[in-house]
């Protein structure tokens, strides 16, 4: 299959490199100079250092040329860039199936990726989302990884899951697009919370409690949004939550660790050099939960720490001193 990955960040590069052993893959990046450097060195030194790119992987900064004869398009740009990418695709005369791998809400609108897809792409477009517990470096190195591929068209999800599995990457088909998207977005907020917890040296008990109650918050908002409960017990929910709240490669967890040490958020993000979707998502989720009356105290406290200057230790005390209630 001929497929094009749009977005040469860490995740787009890792997926393109993994699939290049089985398919004819083109990786598109918007910066021509960076693409030329990658083509010469066969390494994405900025986003994925230490992971050689296979010789079969084509690289391009020409949007139209990269999409020529593509049988599948995978959008791997951040949530903030999804609208522009979809708008560019919508101008094309015909489109193959399209997957997106970004995790989060559109800043300022609180819209999920599938809602932007419905707004911008032609009716009847074949689309889906790929999500789950995955660090780009591990996928690029060929470490075993399992992900969820969800589409409203379960037959499409099954067909693409079969085609894209291999090279120690296993995909499971699902049809709950909303649940998969909500899980992928909210786990980033909980990863920031877990980083704060660890940065304050609160121990393993506190982290376990935070992960468990964080899953409850994810599920509440997900079901309220139309997702299914069982989705949050799967790879794109619990699986992704465990990875990003405990793994040191998690950018969102790193944000939390450094916030807990008192570092300014702007400096953290500048030095990180990569997108940490959970920072933007925290604000959107807190507003969405308040609008709908969905109880999400952890997400709300993360938002207050990041944007309202609430000291992390005070936020923890506030959570622990809430009214005692039934667990379920």
Curated annotation (Swiss-Prot):
One of its GO terms (biological process) is glycerol-3-phosphate biosynthetic process. The active site is at 187 (proton acceptor). Keywords: Cytoplasm, Lipid biosynthesis, Lipid metabolism, NAD, NADP, Nucleotide-binding, Oxidoreductase, Phospholipid biosynthesis, Phospholipid metabolism. One of its GO terms (molecular function) is NAD binding. InterPro entries: 6-PGluconate_DH-like_C_sf (IPR008927), 6PGD_dom2 (IPR013328), G3P_DH_NAD-dep (IPR006168), G3P_DH_NAD-dep_C (IPR006109), G3P_DH_NAD-dep_N (IPR011128), NAD(P)-bd_dom_sf (IPR036291). Pathway: Membrane lipid metabolism; glycerophospholipid metabolism. It catalyses: sn-glycerol 3-phosphate + NAD(+) = dihydroxyacetone phosphate + NADH + H(+); sn-glycerol 3-phosphate + NADP(+) = dihydroxyacetone phosphate + NADPH + H(+). Sn-glycerol 3-phosphate binds at residues 103, 132, 134, 187, 240, 250-252. Its EC number is 1.1.1.94. It is found in: Cytoplasm. NADPH binds at residues 11, 30, 103, 136, 251, 275, 277. It is an enzyme of class 1 (oxidoreductase). One of its GO terms (cellular component) is cytosol. Belongs to the NAD-dependent glycerol-3-phosphate dehydrogenase family. PANTHER family: GLYCEROL-3-PHOSPHATE DEHYDROGENASE, GLYCEROL-3-PHOSPHATE DEHYDROGENASE [NAD(+)] 2, CHLOROPLASTIC. Catalyzes the reduction of the glycolytic intermediate dihydroxyacetone phosphate (DHAP) to sn-glycerol 3-phosphate (G3P), the key precursor for phospholipid synthesis. HAMAP family: NAD_Glyc3P_dehydrog. This is Glycerol-3-phosphate dehydrogenase [NAD(P)+]. It comes from Thiobacillus denitrificans (strain ATCC 25259 / T1). The gene is gpsA.
């Amino acid at each position: 299959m001929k497929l094009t990955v749009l977005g040469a960040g860490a995740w787009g590069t890792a997926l393109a490199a993994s699939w290049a052993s089985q398919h004819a893959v083109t990786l598109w990046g918007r910066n021509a100079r960076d693409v030329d450097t990658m083509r010469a060195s066969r390494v994405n030194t900025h986003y994925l250092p230490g992971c050689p790119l296979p010789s079969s992987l084509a690289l391009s900064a020409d949007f139209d040329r990269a999409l020529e004869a593509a049988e599948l398009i995978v959008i791997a740009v951040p949530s903030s860039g999804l609208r522009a990418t979809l708008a560019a695709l919508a101008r094309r005369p015909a489109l193959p199936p399209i997957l997106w791998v970004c995790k989060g809400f559109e800043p300022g609108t609180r819209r999920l990726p599938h809602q932007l897809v419905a707004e911008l792409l032609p009716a009847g477009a074949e689309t889906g989302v790929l999500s789950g517990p995955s660090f780009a470096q591990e996928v690029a190195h060929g470490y075993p990884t399992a992900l969820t591929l969800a589409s409203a068209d379960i037959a499409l999800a099954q067909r693409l899951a079969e085609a894209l599995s291999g090279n120690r990457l296993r995909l499971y088909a699902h049809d709950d697009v909303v649940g998969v998207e909500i899980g992928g977005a909210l786990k980033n907020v909980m990863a920031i919370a877990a980083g704060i917890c660890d940065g304050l040296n609160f121990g393993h008990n506190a982290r376990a409690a935070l992960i468990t109650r964080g899953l409850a918050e994810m599920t509440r908002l997900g079901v309220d949004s139309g997702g299914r409960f069982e989705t949050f017990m799967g790879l794109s929910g619990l699986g992704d939550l465990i990875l990003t709240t405990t793994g040191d490669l998690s950018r969102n967890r790193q944000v939390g660790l450094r916030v807990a040490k008192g570092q300014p958020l702007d400096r953290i993000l500048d030095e990180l050099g990569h997108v940490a979707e959970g920072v933007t998502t925290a604000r959107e989720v807190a507003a969405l939960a308040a609008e709908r009356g969905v109880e999400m105290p952890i997400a709300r406290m993360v938002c207050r720490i990041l944007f309202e200057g609430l000291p992390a230790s005070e936020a923890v005390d506030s959570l622990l001193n809430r009214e005692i209630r039934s667990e379920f």
